[in-house]
Amino acid sequence: MSSHSPISVHADAILGEDIVMGHGVIVEAGVEIGDGCRIGHHTVLRTGTRLGNKVQIGDQTVLGQQPMRAANSAVTSNARHEGPTIGDRVRIGSSSIIYAGCTLSEDVFVADLATVREDVTVGRKTIIGRGVAIENQCTIGAFCKLETDAYITAYSTVGNHVFVAPGVRTSNDNFIGRTEERFQHFKGVIAEDGARLGVGCTILPGRRVGKDAVIAAGSVLTRDAKPETVYVGVPARAVGPVPPEQLLQNQD
């Protein structure tokens, strides 16, 4: 291992070979770091974090953050989570936070300033763009693209090959923060394989975007979107089929 001292590595940490750590890195108890990893300046690997081989992490990033529950939080638990699992060749940018209890599969890319909350699973080769926020208890499939400042609400499911454009917004609370009844009805969104969400569109709680469906830029989806159908407007309405050449089955 080579480093720019000072760094702090707990005696219980397990380190592979050919690891490079920047200035001020902190490695807590129970951390495992695979071979060939590169860790940027002032990054913190909290208790139980597990890195595969050839993982790259930028500066001032935190892995293994435990959730903090506000006194009136609706969807965050006080339970402690095991450290995150980071697959081989994952790349994580600077000033990002990867919470405990999440899994990033191999070859995932996480850009700067992104947040991935607890109990989240991200499939292989998915891209999480700059400033993206994925809330707790979400499943993100493989080969997805979540672009700058997209927001994935808690309890959501995103399939494989899903495209989420910049500034997409999702919600899980139809009661908009009022009444005790809302606690029984929290429900995230579902985007099936090949769904595409245009720039700045909004998907309301519990709505399902069918396979290969398209939600146009700026639209507000208030009901389920049928597969292979284009939706436009506020509220979004079906305007026709997705062109055959754009369907997932016809891509290389």
Which ranges hold each PLM region?
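C-terminal end-helix/capping segment
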Residues: 235-247
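Phosphate-binding loop/pocket of nucleotide- and phosphate-handling active sites
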Residues: 250-252
